[in-house]
Amino acid sequence: MDTNALRETLLGKYQLRKTEKQKSAFIDWVKTYADEIGIPVIVEESRIFVRSRNIVFGDVDSARVILTAHYDTCARMLLPNFSTPGNLPLFVLEQTFLTLLIVLGGWLAGWGAGALLRGAVHPIVCGLACLLAGVLGSALVLYLMLVGPANPHTANDNTSGVLLILAAMQRLKGKPGVAFVLFDNEEKGLFGSLAFIKAHGQAARRFLVNFDCVGDGNTLLLTGMKGGMRMPQAKRLMAAMEEIAPEYGMKTVSGVFPKWIYPSDQMLFPRGTAFAALKGKRVLYMDRIHTARDTMLEQRNVECLLDILEKI
């Protein structure tokens, strides 16, 4: 199955991977795909707060490089999860705004409880009811952000990363020492990658490249922890990126955490790095994700990254 056929299958049949039923259908298809191209696959189930099912391809314990993406999909938000990985003040402002939304939900719930109960019950009872309503209101907003109704479109976040991993399995299957993992429950709090580290302590110290939201944007970002960006493999990727990306009409940037803050699974790994695609010129940003407007998955981006990975 070529990259375009994989893309059409993912977007047409397996774009939603949020419920247990949706994940099971996706896992069954992926296992069949891996068998067809001759790559060993195992589903590792664990429970760290939530049930996670990581999909592991190849021998991660003896691999020198592990390529990853998260396959779970997010809840729908009314406002996009706008992100500026290379601009710390704006990044902090974005996180502050999300926190204020949670606080606002609690305040509105508390205010509503007060409006209903004030004068009808003892002031102490009213105060306690307002406090409880406020806590529950904030918890509800947080719940909806993490595990609310599924976002109907997930082309960039993170069907693009899943497509990249599945296509790379075909392209790189003859390259020794490369394994692949699709993590579960990144959107709920990196629980899948936490489970992987618990199960594969030594493998978790290998050079790791994570792909999260690589489908929508004209600038490729490679970033990671210092331990990862210092590795020879990272230097080869940066050199390949600078050479190959212009052939696809793309630009490149790279840098080390915390100058570049990109919150995804790679942050848990001492030699973790990540690719993402960004928009903009003076300020590089990512938008549309976590909303119904997440419909862009540029095949050009995936083909460019596949060519870059051949140099790893």
Task: Describe each region flagged by the PLM.
Residues Q15-S62, L79-V121:
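A non-catalytic alpha/beta surface segment that caps or lines the substrate-entry region
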